[in-house]
């Protein structure tokens, strides 16, 4: 009898979970911010979307969650009624590729080779949601009057990270290799690396053209100033955890000791201070 009651409760919870999930997105508004030239940034729920909207049509960088796709499409039409031609993925996570199946019916999906491999391994991922054009190192598109460069970077957030440079507008979309003003996630199971994060950001700071505007994977539109702060946080917090590991401290002890006060405001509901310390601890212990 008890087992039967449990089974009934589980049956009732499935649609409830789906309803709650739908409600999570019910009040999400997609907002557009003009960045420079033909480039815009869309915010909503999930990773920031980069947009090139001009005479050749529309190109998007990332596309958030599947339930938001119609609203994202409506926001794109307000910027430019022209057709969607290209869909770029900075990496494989669902808050950046959730709309692939929807937008993949309209434009060609382009991403690093490992994005297709990892998305292809996901149960239920339809073929239309997979990248149809892949690259290993870099790729250029000539679209809306400028060269748009996709460059794969060494493992940082994942093993399939790319940054997108709108060369004419002088705008760079970093995907999740840059979280502005907050702790990032490191997908250790997906090939991510704290050492790669630090090196990639240090290299980017040296190469960024003067006056460039930066679209982070998460957080507000930024400049190299915020990128430098992000790099400083990565270096300082990783050193704190590295010293704790060298001293034989456990993860719990390291979390209880915490981080310098200056980084308290970088915690977010998704990546709390304790979670960030855990990611650092696991990543640095594995070297």
Task: Annotate the PLM regions.
Residues 57-59, 65-67, 140, 147, ...:
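Metallo-beta-lactamase
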Residues 94-154, 160-162, 206-213, 251:
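Divalent-metal coordination cores built from histidine and acidic residues
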Residues 30-75, 162-166, 170-174:
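Conserved beta-strand hairpin/beta-sheet module of binuclear metal-dependent hydrolase folds
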Residues 36, 49, 69-73, 100, ...:
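Extracytoplasmic/secreted envelope proteins and their assembly/folding machinery
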């Amino acid at each position: 009898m008890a087992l039967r009651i449990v089974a009934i409760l589980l049956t009732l919870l499935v649609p409830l979970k789906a309803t709650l999930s739908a409600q999570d997105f019910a009040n999400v508004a997609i907002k557009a911010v003009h960045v420079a030239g033909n480039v815009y940034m869309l915010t909503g729920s999930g990773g920031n979307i980069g947009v090139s909207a001009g005479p050749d049509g529309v190109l998007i960088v990332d596309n958030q969650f599947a339930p938001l796709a119609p609203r994202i499409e409506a926001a794109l039409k307000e910027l430019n009624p022209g057709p969607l031609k290209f869909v770029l993925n900075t990496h494989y996570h669902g808050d950046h590729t959730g709309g692939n199946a929807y937008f993949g019916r309209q434009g060609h999906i382009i991403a690093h080779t490992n994005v297709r491999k990892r998305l292809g391994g996901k149960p239920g991922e339809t073929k239309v949601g997979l990248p149809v054009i892949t690259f290993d190192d870099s790729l250029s598109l000539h679209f809306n009057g400028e060269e748009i460069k996709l460059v794969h970077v060494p493992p940082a957030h994942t093993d399939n990270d790319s940054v997108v440079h709108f060369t004419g507008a002088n705008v760079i979309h970093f995907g999740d290799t840059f979280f502005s003003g907050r702790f990032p996630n490191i997908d250790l199971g997906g090939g991510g690396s704290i050492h790669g994060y630090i090196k990639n950001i240090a290299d980017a700071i040296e190469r960024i053209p003067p006056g460039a505007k930066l679209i982070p994977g998460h957080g507000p539109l930024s400049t190299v100033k915020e990128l430098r702060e992000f790099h400083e946080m990565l270096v300082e917090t990783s050193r704190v955890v590295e010293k704790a590991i060298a001293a034989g401290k456990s993860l719990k002890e390291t979390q209880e000791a915490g981080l310098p006060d200056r980084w308290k405001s970088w915690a977010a509901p998704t990546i709390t201070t304790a979670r960030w310390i855990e990611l650092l601890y696991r990543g640095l212990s594995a070297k």
